[in-house]
Regions:
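Amphipathic, interaction-prone secondary-structure segments
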Residues: 2-43
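Mixed-charge, Lys/Arg-enriched low-complexity segments
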Residues: 44-179
Length: 179
């Protein structure tokens, strides 16, 4: 599900078929004021927060995640959650790309290369940290076999979300000219 408003604020849930089971990548996107925006480790808010979970997000479970994932280290997590992460936009590049797409244009590759990212993760937690599932539990459930596989999947899915996110925002800026 992709339940974001025209400004890109809301919740997105991606269902991942691993051939053995399903996982869900849950995203909470919010608006940050310029005062709230920082890449420093002491930040308390981020443009997007994520979790990779092995439990299907029912209404109740999604609400539990909504109350905890945006809090990151201050939230409460269980072995159902495999990874916890967060990211901030490159506001300059995100706005540039969404403006170009809204105008029906493709962004200039040189501009993309100058910054290199739409969003940048500022932390990726796994392996039992903050109550998340540890590697042995993940292996017992036959979800992943090697260390850091869940974290790398989470980072990859965050990148995929960033493309969907910027296109969503661009479309809502100008549905008639968006490409």
């Amino acid at each position: 599900s992709f339940d974001l408003d025209q400004n890109g604020v809301g919740t997105a849930v991606y269902k991942i078929n691993t051939n053995d089971t399903y996982l869900w990548f849950v995203v909470f996107a919010q608006h940050l004021s310029s005062e709230e925006r920082t890449d420093r480790v002491i930040a308390e808010k981020w443009d997007a927060t994520f979790t990779l979970t092995c439990e299907e997000p029912t209404i109740d479970y999604l609400e539990k995640l909504r109350c905890n994932v945006p809090l990151q280290e201050m939230g409460r997590f269980t072995a159902k959650e495999l990874v916890l992460s967060r990211a901030n936009k490159s506001v300059r590049l995100f706005d540039y790309v969404s403006d170009e797409l809204a105008a029906g244009l493709q962004p200039d590759p040189e501009q993309l290369m100058n910054v290199g990212y739409l969003i940048r993760t500022t932390a990726v937690y796994g392996n039992g940290k903050f109550g998340l599932s540890d590697l042995e539990n993940i292996r017992r459930q036959n979800l992943f076999k090697l260390p850091f596989q869940p974290e790398m999947l989470c980072v990859y899915l965050a990148r995929c979300f960033s493309f969907d996110w910027v296109e969503h925002v661009a479309y809502h800026k100008s549905p008639d000219s968006f490409r």
